[in-house]
């Protein structure tokens, strides 16, 4: 059982994804964020996942990992991007989910591999506007860790992650932005 999963989305075909994009465009919603391209309900510090034993399931025909989400659409990413091209929309491509709030070196390596695969498969689309790192973060960038040494490690991890990930993405997709969703809680704690 995957929490927060809308069962109706599982039934959507590629054509229904295209219709959704057209409907968004009609409402002047011209920027889309694909939240994630893999589903993996694990959390930082509470798993032993690495790039070799990753068990997440893809929403697209990934060659990196065999697991697939049980959905009707064959390739909803292609359907979304091709329709967004026609509609003149921008899409932020979700690169994730390795594990929630996880910016460790292992997560970085996984993200590099997935970002490159996504670019190789979908980078020809004009609507492919940016990379969106799906893992999210608390505003303090320490993800609510209680121990000072773990708080520092989480902050160091996220800074290193984005420095390296942005440089890596620039090597094959120069100028494409990289985005992370943080919440607004405890932002002052992340300023050090």
Give the positions of each predicted feature.
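Glycan-processing catalytic domains of CAZymes
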Residues: 1-192
């Amino acid at each position: 059982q995957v929490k927060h999963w809308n069962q109706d989305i599982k039934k959507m075909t590629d054509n229904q994804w295209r219709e959704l994009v057209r409907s968004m465009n009609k409402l002047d919603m011209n920027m889309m964020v694909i939240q994630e391209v893999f589903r993996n309900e694990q959390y930082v510090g509470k798993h032993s996942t690495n790039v070799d034993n990753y068990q997440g399931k893809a929403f697209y025909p990934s060659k990196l990992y065999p697991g697939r989400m049980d959905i009707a659409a064959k390739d909803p990413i292609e359907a979304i991007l091709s329709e967004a091209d026609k509609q003149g929309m921008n899409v932020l491509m979700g690169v994730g989910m390795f594990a929630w709030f996880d910016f460790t070196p292992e997560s970085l390596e996984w993200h590099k591999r997935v970002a490159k695969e996504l670019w190789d498969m979908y980078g020809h689309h004009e609507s492919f506007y940016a990379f969106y790192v799906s893992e999210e973060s608390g505003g303090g960038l320490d993800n609510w860790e209680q121990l000072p040494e773990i708080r520092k490690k989480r902050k160091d991890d996220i800074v290193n992650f984005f420095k390296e990930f942005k440089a890596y993405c620039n090597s094959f997709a120069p100028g494409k932005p990289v985005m992370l969703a943080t919440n607004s809680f405890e932002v002052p704690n992340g300023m050090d």
